[in-house]
Amino acid sequence: NPPSGEVITANNKIIPDDYPYLITNDWAEPYRITRITDLLENVQKHSLLTFAQIQLDQTSLMAQEFLPYLLELTPETSLERSALAELLSWDGTMDRNKAAPLIFSAWYRELAKLIYSDELGETFEDYYGFRPLFVSSVLANETKTKWCDDTRTPAEESCEFVESKAFKEAIVYLSNTYGSDISKWQWGTAHYAHSDHAILTDTPLGRFFDIKIPNGGDAFTVNAARFGIGNDEPFTQTNGPGYRALYDLSNLDNSLFIHTTGQSGNPLSGHYQDFAETWRDGRYIPMTMKREDIEKGKMGTLTLNP
């Protein structure tokens, strides 16, 4: 019961450096916990609505941190100029309907590869990931580090060179994958929440029952939507908040919840995926607590016999 009245966790480090016992060395970066804290402290009196807004927040502090490096680049083609124009007015919100999150994520994917693939060699694929604290340290301390230099070439590459090369390669990748019309680029086209069927996923029928829905967010937004930049589909969402709930402890009947996909695991049921868009769009359903209300709203009874 801390004096602040706040209990917050986002897989972040929750212990001081001198804590005597090992819990883990694999803490999440501080972006999400920082954003949650800011959103909590910016409102004097919260409600279910303001807590819902926190749960659904898609502002990436990680993107905001790295965006200035992108905006310093000089574009050389019309497509590069159009891409940078998208980023100039972008605030780091990972909106599924916008091109900027896709451009940024593609650039960062190439940037990480260029910074440390040469040093790691054959082991690179095992460690290919965001690692934003490391990458940020490299870019901020160029005079003290050689990570930006490509050890496979005789020249000594600067971080500015690597940032620019990553941007060019990202634009080529995006144009080859999504076409050269930036107005048709959308984050959700590449970044979709993918839910496999629990049983059928490894069968020939599995792909017919997968649930795929365009989604916003990234690994560093409060509304987490992690993806693996080293994967074959580098922007496909691999995990996120499978269940959201808002509990009103003064009146539990006001509580709300939602989870991904649907209540049924039967692909032929109308409730197999009827929650998917509700979940994605940040809507909730009532958490019915009273037995009489549950009976009124039930759609059937499933009886399990031994």
Identify the residue ranges that each predicted region occupies:
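Cationic-aromatic interfacial patches
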Residues: A85
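Active-site acid/base region of carbohydrate-active enzymes
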Residues: S82
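C-terminal/peripheral segments of proteins
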Residues: N1-E72, E76-L79, S89-P306
